[in-house]
């Protein structure tokens, strides 16, 4: 096999040790293998970089082993051309496995250009990626606290969630804090209702009559304190993300023009894909990297599976949430796409297809520096009007109806509305054409 890089390095990274191999190929094909072990603290990483530079390597490859690869990458990427490999794609031939053999195997694959580089964004994007992922974890913790509060209330036979649409809204929290302070009279607790909830006072008094014990009050107090703590952390994190996203505010605004995409989803897209999507040749490569396209499993001319491949679960999660939000939009191309796919393949596959389309749109907006252009909910009907007409006729004929097609007559303009004399209209103030007439 042809040697592409004559001087290359391979690293087998662990928590406390790094096994490095430098592979040098001579003009006549001879191999010179040099191996050395290093630690993982700062001075050892500096010594590793100096040893690799003194060996004059052209490329250095390493596996993405948990979080252990990140400190090594952060130090070496400043002075050496690095390649991050997916461990699943660089598995060694089954044999006696050792760290020294693994590092040599990685170097050998790199020398023959058999390693597909993983996408590693610039340092600033990586920092924002850690913040957006941490926010997802905090949101999950907040939801877990919500569930624990529901459990305590059910144990105390307080069915508040059957009346309140948001148990932890303004009214719900006021009632919970009053319960923690010792209030248990349903009439007094119902007085904390705000807004339209006041009209449900009788129902509130009914569901607030339960069996509240001292340990319930203690648990509610602790859980409400936990909830306030987590929400304060989310608020501070949002402020930090807002500060770091200022250089990319133009990209955030472009992404927010897509139906179903809010600011948090736009932050996630930029943190996972990067504001510069040139690392992906086209939108199909980006969708494959995110795990939002069918896998390619074929044998003997038959497709064995079409399940989506593994990809970036953080990006996939954000896009699927946006896809669910799109389903509630009206007169929207993405909504029409979802219901079209849902009728053919089911809801879950339709959500993946909609998320795939969202990623394609986001890719083009970031690459072309443009905004979203709505195609309308009738896009597919107008794409093939004759096909749509024939399909609807067949459906009506199956119901026993006889259909006659006639061209639609032009709509006549609506008559002018009559207004009492002496009371002028406000069309001119609103800047619209006046169609009123005075009697």
Where are these regions (language model features)?
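A detector of single, family-specific signature residues
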Residues: 1-439
């Amino acid at each position: 096999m042809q040697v592409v890089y004559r001087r290359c390095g391979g690293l087998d990274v662990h928590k406390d040790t790094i096994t490095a191999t430098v592979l040098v190929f001579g003009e006549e094909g001879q191999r010179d293998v040099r191996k050395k072990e290093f630690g993982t603290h700062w001075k050892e990483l500096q010594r590793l970089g100096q040893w690799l530079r003194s060996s004059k390597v052209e490329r250095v490859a390493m596996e993405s082993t948990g979080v252990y690869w990140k400190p090594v990458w952060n130090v070496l990427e400043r002075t050496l051309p690095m390649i991050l490999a997916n461990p699943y794609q660089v598995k060694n031939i089954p044999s006696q496995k050792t760290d020294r053999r693994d590092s040599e195997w990685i170097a050998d694959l790199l020398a023959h250009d058999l390693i597909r580089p993983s996408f590693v964004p610039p340092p600033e994007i990586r920092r924002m990626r850690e913040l957006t992922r941490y926010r997802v974890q905090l949101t999950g913790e907040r939801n877990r606290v919500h569930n624990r509060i529901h459990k305590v209330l059910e144990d105390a036979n307080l069915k508040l969630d059957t009346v309140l649409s948001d148990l932890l809204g303004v009214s719900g929290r006021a009632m919970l804090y009053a319960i923690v302070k010792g209030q248990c009279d349903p009439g007094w607790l119902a007085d904390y209702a705000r807004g339209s909830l006041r009209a449900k006072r009788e129902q509130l008094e009914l569901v607030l009559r339960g069996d509240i014990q001292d340990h319930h009050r203690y648990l509610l107090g602790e859980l409400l304190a936990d909830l306030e703590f987590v929400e304060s952390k989310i608020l501070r994190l949002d402020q930090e993300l807002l500060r770091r996203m200022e250089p990319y505010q133009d990209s955030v605004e472009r992404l927010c023009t897509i139906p179903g995409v809010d600011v948090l989803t736009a932050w996630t897209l930029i943190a996972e894909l990067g504001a510069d999507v040139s690392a992906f040749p086209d939108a199909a490569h980006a969708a494959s990297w995110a795990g939002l396209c069918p896998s390619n499993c074929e044998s003997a001319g038959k497709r064995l599976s079409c399940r989506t491949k593994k990809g970036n679960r953080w990006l996939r999660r954000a896009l699927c949430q946006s896809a669910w939000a799109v389903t509630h939009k009206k007169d929207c191309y993405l909504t029409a796409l979802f219901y079209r796919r849902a009728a053919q393949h089911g809801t879950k596959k339709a959500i993946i297809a909609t998320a795939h389309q969202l990623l394609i749109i986001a890719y083009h907006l970031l690459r072309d520096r443009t905004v979203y252009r709505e195609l309308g909910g009738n896009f597919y009907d107008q794409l093939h009007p004759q096909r749509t007409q024939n399909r609807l006729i067949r459906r009506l004929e199956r119901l026993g109806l006889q259909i006659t097609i006639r061209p639609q007559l032009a709509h006549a303009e609506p008559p002018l509305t009559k207004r009492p004399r002496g009371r002028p209209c406000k069309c001119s103030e609103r800047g619209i054409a006046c169609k009123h007439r005075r009697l």
